[in-house]
Amino acid sequence: LLKEADVNAGWQIVISIDNGEYGDIYNAIGRKTGASEQLDIWDNPEPPALDQYVSLNMTRKEWGVKSMLTTDIRSMDIINGIWDMNLDIGNVQGPFTVSTDQIGSLPEGHVAVLLDHIEHQIYDISKNQEIVITKAMEEFSYPISMIVGVPAFVEAAAKNILSTIPEKFALHQNFPNPFNPSTHISFSLPKPSNVEVKIYNILGQSVVTLINDWRNLGHHSVQWNGRDKWGESVGTGIYFYSLETADFRQVKKLMLLK
């Protein structure tokens, strides 16, 4: 942790996470005199994972850094900031409890919150709220963010992040419709899901499967070129398309004109 002399020259928030058996006990964000907004000696790599692991880490590809980081300490010259983090797990089960420990004082009037992207929850870490993650999975990273700064910035940043994340599953109307020769089918996922998108004819027979795989949370689109699973063009008429996950199923109608 920081030495006392360092505390007076900045601040850190240490984030730990565990399931009672496995955990990642030291990850830090913060600002420090002498640190920069790019990779420097205060930014440390995440240790390699074992067969069973809990890893809270940060990726900074915009810095040209390929490896994951366990600490991201930035310049004192900037007051507002967002630290995006990922929870990755392997061969372990949740729930996972998140705890924070602040070292040094934030600038007067500043606040720090933890944002859970999946649950759309905002936690003010000064209030010692219980933070529990229940929906982490091995297939995808679980995204959270630490947002620190003046209240107006923190509120706006959290709102902006959440506005990009769907609140519910949705299958949208294809476009164009009617179509020839191809159309786009879009859908929204509020969490990572194993997704199946299929086309059916008017008799309910499967024509082609467009997606049968995991997709991350967010907005997605897939194109149908009017062909069946053998690559043959299908005839003019009404067809149905479906989105199915473990938690959701919806069907909509489309029309192919030639």
Predicted segments — roles?
Residues L1-P176, H184-F187:
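Compositionally biased Ser/Thr/Gly- and acidic/asparagine-rich
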Residues V113-L115, E196-Y200:
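Beta-strand signatures of extracellular beta-sandwich domains
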Residues S126-Q129, V208-R215:
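Solvent-exposed serine/threonine-rich low-complexity stretches and specific carbohydrate-binding patches
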Residues N174-P176, N180, I199-V207, Y239:
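Short, glycine-anchored, charge-dense loop/turn motifs used at functional sites
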Residues N194-E196, V222:
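Short loop/turn microsegments at loop-to-beta-strand junctions
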Residues I211-A246:
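Short, surface-exposed loop/turn motifs with a glycine/proline- and acidic-biased composition
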Residues F248-K252:
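Extracellular and select intracellular beta-sandwich modules with Ser/Thr-enriched
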Residues L254-K258:
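Short beta-strand edge segments in extracellular beta-sheet folds
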